[in-house]
């Protein structure tokens, strides 16, 4: 059994956990850490060891500790400088089992890469005082809408299983060009492949592994609002399928560009957000079997306020980094 971290969360983040290998050429645990963590300067590792910031199961690691195989170590990572995302995470529902939120555009679900503190998970752990909170699923950083979190670690599996067993019904809304020549409603099926380390997913020949139902809800002035119902959960599936119909989602700097290449500003420019919203989430309660349904309160500005969307978003909160 994996031991529990002796370090409490900090800034809403769990400590990093490492397990040393069965053997190796290192004389000391410090030597192993220097080799294991190439992105951390050796001087920083020395400072962390001297300050007792790297711990094992019996306490802080001594800087001269001999290498030991199959040993667990914990430490808190240094936080990168992140521009605050000035948009609020709205709580739709909170009970002793789950937290359901309305995630804004531009906020990642979980810490990853350059986005650590400025994520929905870390914000909610800090703001709600829930150190074991974890997501049952994820939304892309640029997608807004309904996102489900589980309050306790021992209940996470029950909710994640609902998603893996396809017992969760999700609908999305998108704003894209209106083309009366595209027959709707329709079901799009294709094969989507996402390679590790490559930003864009691709549609390739072969047996379909992705399926989306596309319906037209309303249109005006050349733009339309669509309901998208994914029957599978491939990376960037909805964006690829809309592009394949000749209806790229507005604000899509990855799949909506004329060149087919992502724009340089795609990761950092908060103007003109992707017009994709996780609108509803419906699932059977794992305890009672009762159907639970949650709906986003957000709207897609490119349809409701085209001029405002073109001008860019207005920040709606101040973000603090206090513990």
Question: Locations of the language-model features?
Answer:
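RNA pseudouridine synthases
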Residues: 1-323
């Amino acid at each position: 059994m994996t031991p529990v971290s002796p370090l409490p969360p900090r800034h809403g983040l769990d400590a990093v956990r490492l397990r040393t290998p069965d053997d190796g050429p290192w004389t000391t645990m410090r030597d192993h850490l220097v080799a294991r963590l190439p992105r951390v300067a050796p001087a920083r590792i020395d400072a962390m060891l001297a300050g007792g910031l790297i711990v094992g199961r019996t306490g802080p690691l001594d800087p001269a500790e001999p290498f030991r195989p199959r040993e667990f170590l914990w430490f808190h990572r240094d936080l990168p400088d992140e521009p605050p995302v000035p948009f609020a995470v709205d709580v739709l529902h909170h009970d002793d089992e789950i937290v359901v939120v309305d995630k804004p555009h531009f906020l990642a679900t979980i810490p990853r890469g350059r986005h650590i503190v400025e994520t929905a998970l870390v914000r909610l752990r800090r703001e709600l005082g829930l150190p074991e909170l974890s997501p049952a699923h994820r939304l892309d950083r640029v997608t807004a809408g309904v996102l489900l979190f589980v309050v306790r670690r021992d209940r996470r599996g029950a909710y994640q299983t609902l998603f893996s067993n396809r017992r969760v019904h999700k609908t999305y809304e998108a704003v894209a060009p209106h083309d009366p020549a595209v027959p709707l409603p329709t079901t799009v099926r294709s094969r989507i492949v996402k390679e590790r380390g490559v930003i864009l997913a691709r549609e390739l020949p072969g047996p379909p592994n992705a399926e989306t139902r596309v319906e037209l809800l309303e249109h005006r002035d050349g733009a339309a609002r669509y309901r998208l119902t994914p029957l599978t959960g491939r990376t960037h599936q909805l964006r690829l399928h809309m592009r394949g119909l000749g209806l790229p989602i507005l604000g899509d700097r990855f799949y909506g560009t004329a060149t087919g290449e992502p724009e340089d500003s795609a990761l950092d420019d908060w103007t003109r957000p992707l017009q994709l919203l996780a609108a509803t989430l419906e699932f059977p309660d794992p305890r009672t079997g009762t159907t639970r349904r949650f709906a986003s309160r957000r709207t897609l500005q490119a349809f409701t306020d085209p001029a405002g969307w073109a001008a860019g978003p207005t920040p709606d909160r101040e973000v603090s980094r206090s513990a």
